[in-house]
Regions:
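An exposed, glycine/acidic-rich loop-and-rim segment of catalytic or binding clefts
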Residues: 38-399
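Sec/Tat signal peptide C-region and signal peptidase I cleavage site
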Residues: 33-37
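Bacterial N-terminal signal peptides
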Residues: 19-31
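Compositionally biased regions
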Residues: 13-14, 32, 397
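N-terminal secretory signal peptides that target proteins for export/translocation
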Residues: 1-15
Length: 399
């Protein structure tokens, strides 16, 4: 594929694959095909890990032709193909070029992150009177579960029935002591690409020993298209009156503070880059946005509107709904041009943004934060939905 890619003048195999898909769609139309087709789930070999495990790539396509691709390695979402207001399709998920890149490069691109997403301060926590010393992989802290966490594992993938689209369930059993966390953790994550053009992510997690957990998906979005440049002019709304302030090493202080009067106030649509260079101390600490927003939730764990992102140029919209209490907005501050993405371009700060639905960072060390403890006999359930559209009305904001 590499030689053919160069011969035809494409910058990457992903670009060439999308070109072939467009040609196939045109051929279907010429032969009398229609725009809508039955939802499908296909898979093909993708490569072999450094540890010798075979990895497959899965392609989900809904009735309207919306397409998502993911790997059995880390559950990595490599591609989300979404039309703009004129019907032009672009991949809006940042990705990497090869399996080896996903194994070795930083950034957690598109991956399922756990056993504990985000940071645990000092790489330790105390549970039931016992202190667990984790593996520090972010300065003195533990980030996204450790250096060899669930985003670096091969998951079992099974097709799943979905009345409203196409679905697959990814399963992994993390042994007791994995990355020094207690308990054998059984995790099932179901990706559903619905026929109303949404990606639904459902988590189901159980343990055989008291432990702590936090799960999210670490996809970077660029609504103008992967490799199109900065998202600074794309607009964002976050349904949050409060956030959790951080220390210089990005650990929550334990305070829950109002966003009003700060650059973290996204309660109305605002360009992501409008206040990115603010001298506000929180922005200086994170070199941009890397903050946990406390969502304005309804009663209980109800699925509520969390955030909207919009690209005025293309008209593409993502609306995010979740049962989680918070969302981490991250503006890819760690990207410095050293990583070449699947688009063939180098990734830099503001090349993409994340909407990482989650419990609060460092909750095991902050008793005033919502608990992340999980006990035997309990099953943790969480749902996040990313709905894709163009120029759509804003959902109502629950209070």
């Amino acid at each position: 594929m590499t030689d053919l890619t160069r011969c035809l003048g494409f910058r990457s195999s992903a670009k060439l694959a999308r070109a072939f898909a467009i040609v196939a769609a045109l051929a279907a139309a010429i032969s009398g095909g229609t725009a809508d087709a039955a939802a499908t789930l296909d898979h093909a070999p993708y490569g072999t890990t450094q540890g010798g495990q075979a990895v497959d790539i899965f392609t989900m396509t809904n009735d309207h032709g919306l397409r998502l691709r993911f790997l059995s390695y880390g559950g990595v979402i490599t591609e989300i193909d979404v039309p703009d207001r004129a019907g032009r399709v672009e991949d809006i998920a940042l990705g990497l070029r090869t399996l080896r890149d996903y194994e070795t490069l930083p950034g957690h691109f598109g991956a399922i992150t756990g056993r504990y997403a985000n940071r645990i301060g000092g790489a330790q926590f105390t549970l039931n009177g016992q202190t667990y010393h984790l593996i520090a992989n972010n300065g003195p802290n533990t980030l996204h579960g450790g250096p060899n966490a669930l985003d670096h594992q091969s998951w079992t993938v099974s097709p799943t029935q979905a009345p409203d689209g196409v679905a697959a369930t990814l399963s992994y059993v993390s042994p007791d002591g994995d990355q020094n966390f207690p308990g054998t953790l059984t995790t099932h994550v179901t990706y559903t690409l619905t026929n109303d053009n949404a990606l639904r992510v459902d988590y189901a997690v159980s343990t055989d020993k008291d432990t702590v957990i936090n799960f999210t998906n670490h996809s970077y979005f660029n609504l103008a298209g992967n490799g199109s440049g900065s998202v600074a002019d794309q607009t964002l709304l976050v349904n949050a009156d409060r956030y959790t302030p951080i220390t210089p090493d990005l650990i929550p202080t334990g305070e829950i503070a109002p966003v009003e009067g700060t650059p973290l106030d996204f309660r109305h649509m605002l360009p992501i880059g409008a206040r990115l260079s603010s001298a506000f101390q929180q922005m200086v600490y994170a070199h941009g946005y890397d903050h946990n927003f406390v969502l304005n939730k309804g009663p209980g764990d109800s699925l509520t509107f969390a955030a909207r992102a919009y690209d005025p140029r293309s008209g593409r919209v993502i609306d995010c709904f979740t049962t989680e209490p918070a969302v981490q907005v991250y503006t890819s501050n760690g990207m410095n041009g050293s990583v070449v993405g699947s688009s063939g371009t180098t990734y830099r700060q503001t090349e993409g943004f994340t909407l990482e639905t989650q419990h609060f960072p460092d909750s095991p060390n902050k008793p005033n934060f919502p608990t992340t403890e999980l006990k035997p006999g309990q099953e943790f359930h969480s749902t996040t939905i990313f709905r894709f559209a163009t120029d759509a009305p804003l959902p109502s904001l629950p209070r």
